[in-house]
Each structure stands twice: as structure tokens, then as C-alpha cells.
From Swiss-Prot:
InterPro entries registered for this protein in UniProt: Aldolase_TIM, DapA, DapA-like, Schiff_base-form_aldolases_AS, Schiff_base-form_aldolases_CS
Similarity comment: family membership: Belongs to the DapA family.
Name the UniProt record assigns to this protein: 4-hydroxy-tetrahydrodipicolinate synthase
Site (Part of a proton relay during catalysis): T45, Y108
Single GO molecular function: 4-hydroxy-tetrahydrodipicolinate synthase activity
Top-tier EC class: lyase
Catalysis performed (reactions): L-aspartate 4-semialdehyde + pyruvate = (2S,4S)-4-hydroxy-2,3,4,5-tetrahydrodipicolinate + H2O + H(+)
Known role: Catalyzes the condensation of (S)-aspartate-beta-semialdehyde [(S)-ASA] and pyruvate to 4-hydroxy-tetrahydrodipicolinate (HTPA).
Length: 297
């Protein structure tokens, strides 16, 4: 059984002056489950994990697991460019009850493909739950190549898939060809969900689902149920919104959008800052076109 199929939300982390706003996080989790979200990814890039303390990350993972209470899968972001730290966080997430892990490739260190195999092998041998690799070269300066997944599979059996955010559809096709249908591929880009699903992908780990969870669930479910035309049309319809949510570094626009929509998820953490006036006006105009802003905004 795959970790999930359909729409997994890379959920934002709401903050207040005390730190993580757990009351608001709980409200968001309940809303996502009601709206049909198929999995929750906690402590990812969109969740600003890189500017959370380790204690905050662990509290957020534990809280999410307990709040979801088995209704949908909880996938914990536990990656690090320090292998030992990634192991520690992965062991914690497993002990807290996470269903799976999302582990980014090491950033900044710029290891080799051989180093990637060693890194993920070390993490995988410390846990039993499934691991989904997160490949996002634009953030890590490192691209995990298709043949590296095959080499890794010779060493471990609980690395079950990849969140592919390279933007290279040919690379995704090659991963699918080399690894076969049992290897789970999820789009890491909201504007490539249906193209990646057409190559055997099972869904998306989505930023856009933070503001329109029902729509992303509907689109991915349509494809999974064989309604290719509906899924394609929805992808094309939503792409201008996807573009607006990446006009500045994620999660700046999506968190701004959520606050504009009345979700009150609080501030960004430095070094992320508020949007420029020009980009903010553009974001507002796009949100308005999709009927996502109240008249007061």
C-alpha cells in the first residue's frame, strides 16, 4: 500500500508571540480533513521547519499525530544536511507515531551521488516506517539522479518514493521507468501535478492545498478515477493561482494569502519577510479572481 494517493498538504506552521500556535494548527488540521485532504505533511519547507527549534518541530509532529488520530496519514519532515540529526529526528517522528517521513536531500554540503546513497541508507536503517525522499535542486544545489534511487534500493527497502520538485519531467519519467510501478512518485510542484501523474505519479505534496484543499483533492481524485479531461482542465485552471503562490519564495505568498483569507496563521520567521507592495497587490488580484478574498480585502 502506498503512503497515500491524491493530495497531501505541506501544511503551514501558524505562529504567534509564544511560538507555534497549536490551537490554530489544530483548526487547520480539522479543516483539511473535512475538505478531503489525503495526507498532512508537517515540518516541511512550507511549514518553515528550518526556522523552528528542534523542540518546536518535535512538538508539532507529536501534536499533529495526536490531532489527526489515524484519520489520514501524517508524514513528518525530518531531513537535515547533518545525517546524525536527520537520524535523530526520524527516530523521534517514528516514536511519536508518524506514518511516514519526508526527508530532503542534504543541502549546502553538496555531497556526491554516492554520498546520497550513504546518507539515506544510514537514516533508513534506524527506522521501520516508509521514507519519501524530497528532491528539490533549486533549494539544495543537488539533484538526486534516477540511477541513484536504483542503487539505494539495493541497500534498503523502506525508501518507498520521492517528492520530485526538480521541474524536469524527463527526469521524472526516467525515475518511473527505472524504479517501476511500486516506487511512489509525488509531484513537488503544484503546476506539474497532472503531468507527473500521467507518468505514474500518485499525487502531490502541495503548497496550494493550504488555501484550496478541496480543489486539489478533487483534481487528483479525478485523475486517479480515470477522468483525465477533468483533471487536465483543473490543472490548467489552477496554474495562474499556483504561479501567484510562488511569485516570491515559498512560503511567503501562501502564508500571506492565508492571512488575507482570514485564517490568521501569524507572521513569517526571519529571514523570511513580508511581500513587496507590488507582489502583494498581484497576489490579491489573483486571489480575488478565484473568489478567495472577502470584500473587505
Amino acid at each position: 500500500m502506498p503512503v497515500f494517493k491524491g493530495s497531501g498538504v505541506a501544511i503551514v506552521t501558524p505562529f504567534n508571540e509564544e511560538g507555534v500556535n497549536f490551537e490554530k494548527l489544530g483548526e487547520l488540521i480539522e479543516w483539511h480533513i473535512k475538505e478531503g485532504t489525503d495526507a498532512i505533511i508537517i515540518c516541511g519547507t512550507t511549514g518553515e521547519a528550518s526556522t523552528m527549534t528542534q523542540e518546536e518541530q518535535q512538538q508539532a509532529i507529536k501534536f499533529t499525530v495526536e490531532k489527526v488520530a489515524g484519520r489520514i496519514p501524517v508524514i513528518a519532515g525530518t531531513g537535515s544536511n547533518n545525517t546524525a540529526h536527520a537520524v535523530e529526528m526520524s527516530e523521534y517522528a517514528q516514536s511519536a507515531g508518524a506514518d511516514a517521513l519526508l526527508v530532503i536531500t542534504p543541502y549546502y554540503n553538496k555531497t556526491t551521488q554516492k554520498g546520497l546513497v550513504a546518507h539515506f541508507t544510514e537514516i533508513a536503517r534506524h527506522v521501520d516506517i516508509p521514507i519519501i525522499i524530497y528532491n528539490v535542486p533549486s533549494r539544495t544545489s543537488l539533484n538526486m539522479l534516477p540511477e541513484t534511487y536504483l542503487e539505494l534500493s539495493k541497500h534498503v527497502d523502506n525508501v518507498v518514493g520521492v517528492k520530485e520538485a526538480s521541474g524536469d519531467i524527463v527526469q521524472v519519467a526516467e525515475i518511473a521507468r527505472i524504479m517501476g510501478k511500486s516506487f511512489e512518485i509525488y509531484s513537488g510542484n503544484d503546476d506539474q501535478v497532472i503531468p507527473i501523474m500521467s507518468l505514474g505519479g500518485l499525487g502531490v505534496i502541495s503548497v496550494t492545498a493550504n488555501i484550496i484543499p478541496a480543489k486539489i483533492h478533487e483534481m487528483t481524485t479525478a485523475y486517479l478515477n480515470g477522468d483525465i479531461e477533468k483533471a487536465r482542465d483543473m490543472q490548467l485552471e489552477l496554474n495562474p493561482l499556483n504561479k501567484a503562490l510562488f511569485i516570491e519564495t515559498n512560503p511567503i505568498p501562501v502564508k500571506t494569502a492565508m492571512n488575507l483569507m482570514g485564517f490568521n496563521v501569524g507572521p513569517l520567521r526571519l529571514p523570511l519577510v513580508e511581500m513587496s507592495d507590488k507582489n502583494l497587490e498581484y497576489l490579491k488580484s489573483v486571489l480575488s479572481k478565484y473568489g478567495l478574498l472577502k470584500e473587505a480585502n
